[in-house]
A protein has these predicted regions:
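Acidic/glycine-enriched connector segments
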Residues: 1-140
Length: 140
């Protein structure tokens, strides 16, 4: 079975959140036979989950950590070797190659569709930073 993680770029990290992720992942491995974890990027939640799953991998070495890229369809061996220090495999789904600016959204949709279990981090009080005004879109 496959699990994935989706969450805000910025999170309010705490020991409680880390412990909740750890217990959830252990339960999925031990009770639901989840053995593959898909990760995205550009998210503090992804980073925390990768760190937690990597720690658990020391106890459950059969699990796999897969980095699903949203950019760089073709990577050289040096970059791949770098990624494989943290993950067991990496790839970019076919449908993402032509997604343009929506590549990260398309990647997340792909991971949700591919997974049997999705672990979400959602903070209803989270407000993403405002984008700066551009030449054609001025603030008033």
């Amino acid at each position: 079975m496959i699990a994935t993680f989706i969450g805000h770029r910025k999170i309010q990290n705490s020991e409680l959140l880390t412990e909740q992720i750890k217990q959830t992942v252990l339960n999925l491995i031990d009770e639901k036979q989840v053995d593959t974890f898909l990760f995205g990027s550009r998210s503090a939640f992804d980073d925390l989950c990768l760190e937690t799953v990597t720690e658990i991998k020391k106890l459950r070495p059969h699990i796999k950590r897969i980095y699903v890229r949203a950019a760089y369809p073709y990577i050289d061996s040096a970059y791949e070797a770098y990624l494989l220090k943290f993950y067991d495999a990496t790839y970019i789904p076919d449908k993402i190659e032509n997604a343009g600016k929506a590549a990260y959204v398309a990647r997340n949709e792909y991971m949700i569709d591919k997974a049997d279990v999705c672990i979400f981090y959602y903070n209803e009080n989270y407000q993403p930073p405002l984008k700066p005004a551009t030449k054609n879109n001025t603030k008033t």
